[in-house]
A protein has these predicted regions:
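Surface-exposed binding/hinge segments that line
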Residues: 120, 132-206
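Ligand-site clamp/hinge motif
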Residues: 246-293, 436
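Periplasmic binding protein-like
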Residues: 42, 111, 411, 428-478, ...
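Append "and occasionally in soluble cytosolic enzymes with long acidic Gly/Pro-rich linkers
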Residues: 242, 322-428, 487
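Gly/Pro-rich hinge or "lid" segments in bacterial periplasmic/extracellular proteins
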Residues: 77-80, 157-158, 166, 184-255, ...
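Extracytoplasmic/peripheral linker and loop segments enriched in polar/acidic and small residues
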Residues: 171, 378-384, 438-447, 472-496
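Aromatic- and charge-enriched surface segment that lines or borders ligand/interaction sites
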Residues: 87-139, 181, 320-322
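N-terminal lobe/hinge region of extracytoplasmic solute-binding protein
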Residues: 43-93, 223
Length: 496
C-alpha cells in the first residue's frame, strides 16, 4: 500500500487518538442539578444529520442511535461482545457462515413483532445505491454477493455495471424468523464487532415503505427497537426519549432506571457549559476550550482516551492536490507537538502515523510495513524544524518556490471544539510556506454532507474507530467507500 499517497494530513491522536472531553453532574447535589435519576438531560452534539442507522456516519448521531436501536450483538461495559437481539450465535469452522438465533418475544417500539426477517431486510437495504449508505461496504462488503447485489459499481462513476439485485446478498432469515444466516466471501475475524455496530441495526420495513425518508425525522413514524424511543423532537432544540415499554434485548431492563432521556441539541460549547452550570443538562460533551485549564482536576470534569485520528482531507478532484509533493509539503508544515499540546491543550496526542497507538498492530506490523515502504523511517518525523525545511523543499520541487504561484486554499470546518483554533493555526503554519489559507465556517447540518459530496478544497476530518482493527481506518481510502471524503482513487490500493 502506498500510504504516502493518501489524501489526508494526520494531525493529532491519543490512546490513541483523541480525548473525549466532558462533564457530568456526579459531583453535584440533587438540589443543584434539579433532576432525578428518572429524568436526565445530556448534550452530545447538535441536531443530528440523520437518525437512520443506515445513513449515519457521525459520532453524535451514533451515540443517540445506541439508545434507540439494538443490533444482533452489543458491546458491554467491559468491552466484550455479547448478545443483543440475538441470544446466541455460531460460526462455522471455516469462519464463513455465521448463524444468529433471535431472542424470544422481540418487538418493535410500536408493539409489532420483530424477527430475523427484519434484519435480512435491513442488511439488504444497505446494498441500494440510491440509499448511498456511507458504511455499507465497511459492514457488509465481506458478505458473499455484496458487489453483485450492488450491481458491481464502476469505481470511477459509482454507477452499476450489472443489474442490482439485493437478494444476491447471502443473508437469509429462516421461515419462522428465529434465525439469521450470513455467509461471508472470506473470513472476517471482527465480524462479531460489526454485528454490534449501529449500521446493522434492524429497521422497520412497514414505516419506511409508508413514509419514505421522512420515517426517521418524526417521533410518530420513528419505529425502533432499543431501550428508548423518541417521544418528542424539536429540531435544533431537543430530542426527548422515553423508555421503550416493548424493549427486549441484551440490556437488563431492571437497570435502565432513567425514564426520560433528553438530548439537548447544541453545538456551541459556551451554551452547553451554561446549560450544565444552570442544571439544565446533567452531562455535556462540549466545554469552551478556554475553560479547560480551570476545570482540569475537578471531580465532574472527565478527559477519557478514545481510539481515533484527527486529520485534514484534501479533495483530490482539485488539481493542485493531485501533486504528491504538494500534499507532502502541506503535511510536513504542521507542528504536531504544538497542535496537540498548545492548540488542543493536551487533550490530543501528536500523530506521526495515520493509525495511532492503541490500535491492534499499529506499533507492530502496520508501522513496520509503513517504514519499509519509506526507506526504514516514518513519513513524518518528530523533528519539526527538519520537517519544515523538507516541506519547503517539496513545495519548491512541485514548482512553487516560497509559495510563488500557489493558489489560495479554502479550508472548511464547523465551529465546535478546537476546530476554529486549529484552522487559525493552519493559516499561520502555511504562511511559512508562502501559502494563503481562507477559513470557511460551515454549519454542522451542512458540513458533513458537503464534505462527503466533495464540495470543498480542504476540510477538517476525523475518524473514531468503529472496531479495533487498522482496516477500519485504511478502508476509508478505497474508491468505493462511502466515507472516502478525499476522493482518493488508486486501483492498486483497491486491489490490495
Amino acid at each position: 500500500m502506498k500510504l504516502k499517497r493518501l489524501a489526508a494530513i494526520v494531525l493529532a491522536l491519543t490512546l490513541s487518538s483523541s480525548m473525549l472531553v466532558g462533564m457530568t453532574a456526579c459531583g453535584k447535589k440533587e438540589d443543584d442539578t434539579k433532576t432525578k435519576a428518572s429524568e436526565v438531560t445530556v448534550q452530545i452534539g447538535p441536531n443530528p444529520e440523520t437518525l437512520d442507522p443506515a445513513l449515519n456516519s457521525a459520532v453524535d448521531g451514533g451515540n443517540m442511535l445506541v439508545t434507540l436501536f439494538e443490533p444482533l450483538l452489543i458491546i458491554d461495559k467491559d468491552n466484550n461482545v455479547v448478545g443483543g437481539q440475538a441470544e446466541k450465535w455460531e460460526v462455522s469452522d471455516d469462519g464463513l457462515t455465521w448463524t444468529f438465533t433471535m431472542r424470544d418475544g422481540l418487538k418493535w417500539s410500536d408493539g409489532s413483532e420483530l424477527t430475523a426477517k427484519d434484519f435480512e431486510y435491513a442488511f439488504k437495504r444497505l446494498t441500494d445505491l440510491d440509499l448511498a449508505s456511507p458504511y455499507a461496504e465497511t459492514v457488509i462488503g465481506m458478505v458473499e454477493g455484496y458487489a453483485d447485489a450492488c450491481g458491481n459499481p464502476d469505481p470511477n462513476t459509482g454507477d452499476p455495471t450489472t443489474e442490482p439485485n439485493k437478494d444476491l446478498l447471502n443473508v437469509k432469515a429462516s421461515e419462522d424468523g428465529k434465525t439469521l444466516t450470513i455467509v461471508l466471501a472470506y473470513p472476517c475475524s471482527y465480524f462479531d464487532k460489526l454485528a454490534a455496530f449501529a449500521t446493522l441495526s434492524p429497521v422497520n420495513e412497514a414505516t419506511i415503505t409508508a413514509n419514505g425518508d421522512a420515517w426517521a425525522v418524526k417521533p410518530e413514524t420513528y419505529v425502533c427497537n432499543g431501550p428508548y424511543m423518541i417521544s418528542e423532537w424539536t429540531p435544533n432544540e431537543r430530542i426527548v426519549c422515553k423508555k421503550n415499554p416493548n424493549y427486549v434485548g441484551g440490556w437488563d431492563n431492571s437497570k435502565i432506571v432513567t425514564d426520560t432521556l433528553t438530548f439537548l441539541l447544541l453545538e456551541d460549547s459556551s451554551a452547553s457549559f451554561a446549560a450544565y452550570n444552570s442544571g439544565t443538562a446533567q452531562l455535556i460533551k462540549d466545554v469552551p476550550t478556554e475553560e479547560i485549564p480551570s476545570l482540569t482536576g475537578k471531580e465532574d470534569f472527565h478527559v477519557d482516551p478514545i481510539l481515533g485520528t484527527y486529520y485534514i482531507s484534501m479533495n483530490l478532484n482539485n488539481e493542485i492536490f493531485q501533486n504528491p509533493l504538494v500534499r507532502k509539503a502541506l503535511t510536513l508544515a504542521i507542528d504536531r507537538e504544538y497542535v496537540a499540546n498548545t492548540v488542543m491543550q493536551g487533550t490530543y496526542s501528536p500523530a506521526y502515523n495515520y493509525v495511532g497507538p492503541g490500535v491492534v498492530d499499529a506499533e507492530g506490523m502496520f508501522l513496520d510495513n509503513s517504514k519499509a515502504a519509506n526507506g526504514g523511517k516514518t513519513y513524518i518525523g518528530e523533528d519539526f524544524a527538519a520537517n519544515l525545511e523538507e516541506a519547503k523543499a517539496a513545495l519548491a520541487e512541485a514548482g512553487y518556490p516560497n509559495g510563488e504561484g500557489f493558489p489560495t486554499i479554502t479550508y472548511s470546518t464547523n465551529e465546535a471544539g478546537y476546530h476554529i483554533p486549529l484552522a487559525e493555526y493552519l493559516q499561520q503554519a502555511y504562511k511559512e510556506l508562502g501559502i494563503t489559507l481562507n477559513i470557511d465556517k460551515v454549519e454542522w447540518a451542512s458540513f458533513t454532507p458537503q464534505r462527503r459530496a466533495g464540495e470543498y478544497e480542504m476540510a477538517r476530518n476525523g475518524w473514531v474507530m468503529d472496531y479495533n482493527d487498522a482496516s477500519n481506518m485504511i478502508e476509508l481510502f478505497y474508491s468505493s467507500n462511502g466515507n472516502n471524503d478525499g476522493k482518493y482513487n488508486n486501483p492498486d490500493f483497491d486491489a490490495a
